[in-house]
């Protein structure tokens, strides 16, 4: 069995990253893909469930996992911890499952260092005006919060060149097709094809 591929995907809030991943998972596809579920110490929100949206644990449990080096990456955001379990990621990859990891550029740097075979994708909006419009249409934040999100978005977008692939989310269906193309291309690269067809290649080259 060939090993799965870890895909890191990052984007500013409001770019449509979650919708894009959900859209991809709903389509019939050649490869088995799952989204990584992070651990967090924040309170569970209405509509969320343990093991589906996050693994909700206490700060004490999270700190123990840090000491045990159980996380590929973790961060503290607004007094709550968020982290990606090394064991769960490695288990899925060894089972031949591709994993999508939705994290910011700082977490992406940690993952690249620890898992250099991972591939990273950055998602950009078609314009600042469109990004602002999408944030407004969500109806979740005040004007002050939206302004702060826009400032943070510019900071995040400055790191796009650190990624392997870049997708502009202007047309939703085209963006999904671009994402599918990236996954297919990675599976067809020499490294993965050689591992997948090692027996066949050995037989073909036997004199």
Curated annotation (Swiss-Prot):
Enzyme Commission no: 2.7.4.8
Keywords: ATP-binding, Cytoplasm, Kinase, Nucleotide-binding, Transferase
GO molecular function, one term: guanylate kinase activity
Domain Guanylate kinase-like: 4-184
Keyword Cytoplasm listed: yes
Residue sites binding ATP per the record: 11-18
SMART domains the UniProt entry points to: GuKc
UniProt KW Transferase keyword: yes
Subcellular location: Cytoplasm
Reaction equation(s) it catalyzes: GMP + ATP = GDP + ADP
GO cellular component, one term: cytosol
PANTHER family from the UniProt entry: GUANYLATE KINASE, GUANYLATE KINASE-RELATED
Function, as annotated: Essential for recycling GMP and indirectly, cGMP.
Family in the record: Belongs to the guanylate kinase family.
Name of the molecule in the record: Guanylate kinase
Organism, scientific name: Buchnera aphidicola subsp. Schizaphis graminum (strain Sg)
């Amino acid at each position: 069995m060939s090993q799965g591929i870890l895909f890191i995907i990052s984007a500013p809030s409001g770019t449509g990253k979650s919708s894009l991943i959900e859209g991809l998972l709903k389509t019939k596809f050649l490869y088995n893909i799952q989204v990584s579920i992070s651990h967090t110490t924040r309170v569970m929100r209405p509509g969320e469930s343990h093991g589906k949206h996050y693994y909700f644990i206490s700060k004490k449990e999270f700190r123990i996992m840090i000491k045990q080096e159980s996380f590929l990456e973790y961060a503290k955001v607004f007094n709550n911890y968020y982290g990606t379990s090394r064991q769960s990621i490695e288990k899925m990859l060894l089972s031949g499952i591709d994993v999508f990891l939705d994290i910011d550029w700082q977490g992406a740097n940690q993952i690249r260092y620890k898992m250099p075979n991972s591939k990273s994708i950055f998602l950009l909006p078609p314009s600042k005006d469109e990004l602002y419009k999408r944030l407004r249409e969500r109806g979740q934040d005040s004007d002050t919060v939206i302004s702060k999100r826009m400032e943070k978005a510019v900071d995040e977008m400055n790191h796009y060149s650190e990624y392997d692939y870049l997708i502009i989310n202007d047309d939703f269906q085209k963006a999904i097709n671009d994402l599918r193309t990236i996954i297919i291309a990675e599976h067809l690269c020499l490294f993965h094809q050689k591992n997948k067809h090692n027996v066949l290649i050995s037989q073909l080259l036997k004199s």
